[in-house]
Design a protein with these regions (language model features):
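Alpha/beta-hydrolase fold catalytic core
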Residues: 1-16
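Flexible, charged surface loops at secondary-structure boundaries
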Residues: 11-13, 154-157
């Protein structure tokens, strides 16, 4: 509530499509406040329409790419992707697969920079991921060809903004930020927790 006066001062959107991607175990409802805010600022806000995010899966990745391409072609405008936590990994993947359709990539506390040695996330996060998504935990995705491509070609040819917090508690700051060319990539430190 204390941030509403500051948020009200932000510039209005130009009506271009913005696709919101939920974090691990989140669904469209988990981003309802963000959807309401961005819609009120003049953006054409869409949700991913794939239900609960239960991990980085091929069917979701393919459906996301199709949705990005459909939004781009149906509106005639490039799409901004906003992904929270694991949703940011999906957004990064979508931007790499369809850069000609993406205007801007925004990640919110997303593990977009996990090295081949695996995530430094807390043990609790890893246990939860093992229980829901895959028994090997988040490290299983580091070995997959799709994620290997993310590591090798981390930066899509679109502007990218990574929001991170030193007090995130789930995704370490070094995994939520990227090094890239100035003017195309920015890391923005914010105050707050992961949720």
């Amino acid at each position: 509530p204390f941030s509403w006066p500051l948020l009200a001062q932000l510039p209005r959107g130009d009506g271009h499509p913005v696709l919101l991607l939920p974090g691990f175990m989140g669904d469209e409802g988990s981003l309802s406040a963000l959807k309401l805010f961005l819609g009120g600022r003049g953006y054409d806000v869409q949700t991913w329409g794939l239900g609960r995010n239960i991990g980085f899966q091929r069917r979701h990745a393919q459906a996301l790419e199709q949705k990005i391409r459909h939004l781009h072609h149906s509106t005639g405008r490039r799409v901004s992707l906003v992904g929270w936590s694991l949703g940011g990994v999906f957004a990064l993947y979508g931007a790499l697969q369809a850069p000609e359709c993406v205007r801007h990539l925004v990640t919110l506390g997303s593990p977009v920079n996990v090295g081949p040695e695996g995530s430094q996330a807390s043990p609790l996060v890893k246990v939860l991921y093992r229980m829901v998504a895959h028994p090997m935990g988040p490290e299983v995705h580091v070995m997959q060809p799709r994620v290997k491509r993310l590591r090798e070609h981390l930066l899509p040819d679109v502007p990218m903004s990574c929001l991170y917090s030193l007090s995130d508690g789930v995704v370490p700051p070094q995994e939520a930020t990227v090094d890239g060319p100035a003017g195309r990539c920015e890391n923005i430190r914010v105050s707050g927790s992961h949720t």
